[in-house]
């Protein structure tokens, strides 16, 4: 069984037992999180599609860890004008383990 969920403005295809890095969620490590924005659920040949979300469908996850992605370096430059700007960014994430999918 698999589901397409929406969290942090992005969509992910998940199945039970899978680990997934999503945008940071304010929850403690080891806490159970319930995601209710389910776009689609499929099992074998049967597929349920929401408009836009499936009513009553949930995905239960456990927070495994919190962390930060690798640094992304931004460099802006104007040729011949002696203008250079350097900037870095590290995005926070939460790693989830998908426990159950209920449709």
Swiss-Prot record:
Record InterPro entries: bL21-like, bL21-like_sf, Ribosomal_bL21, Ribosomal_bL21_CS
GO cellular component, one term: cytoplasm
Top-level taxon of the source organism: Bacteria
GO terms for MF: rRNA binding; structural constituent of ribosome
Cystine crosslinks: none
UniProt KW keywords: Ribonucleoprotein, Ribosomal protein, RNA-binding, rRNA-binding
UniProt keyword Secreted present: no
Gene Ontology biological process terms, A to Z: translation
Function in brief: This protein binds to 23S rRNA in the presence of protein L20.
NCBIfam families: L21
Protein family per UniProt: Belongs to the bacterial ribosomal protein bL21 family.
Subunit organization: Part of the 50S ribosomal subunit. Contacts protein L20.
HAMAP family: Ribosomal_bL21
Protein name: Large ribosomal subunit protein bL21
């Amino acid at each position: 069984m698999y589901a397409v969920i929406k969290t942090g403005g992005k969509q992910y295809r998940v199945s039970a037992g899978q680990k997934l890095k999503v945008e940071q969620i304010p929850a403690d490590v080891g806490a159970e999180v319930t995601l209710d924005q389910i776009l689609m659920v499929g099992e074998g040949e049967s597929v349920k599609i929401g408009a836009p979300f499936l009513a009553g469908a949930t995905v239960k996850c456990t927070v495994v860890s919190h962390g930060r992605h690798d640094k992304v370096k931004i460099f802006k430059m104007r040729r011949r004008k002696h203008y250079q700007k350097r900037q870095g960014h590290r995005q926070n994430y939460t790693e989830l383990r998908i426990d159950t999918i209920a449709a």
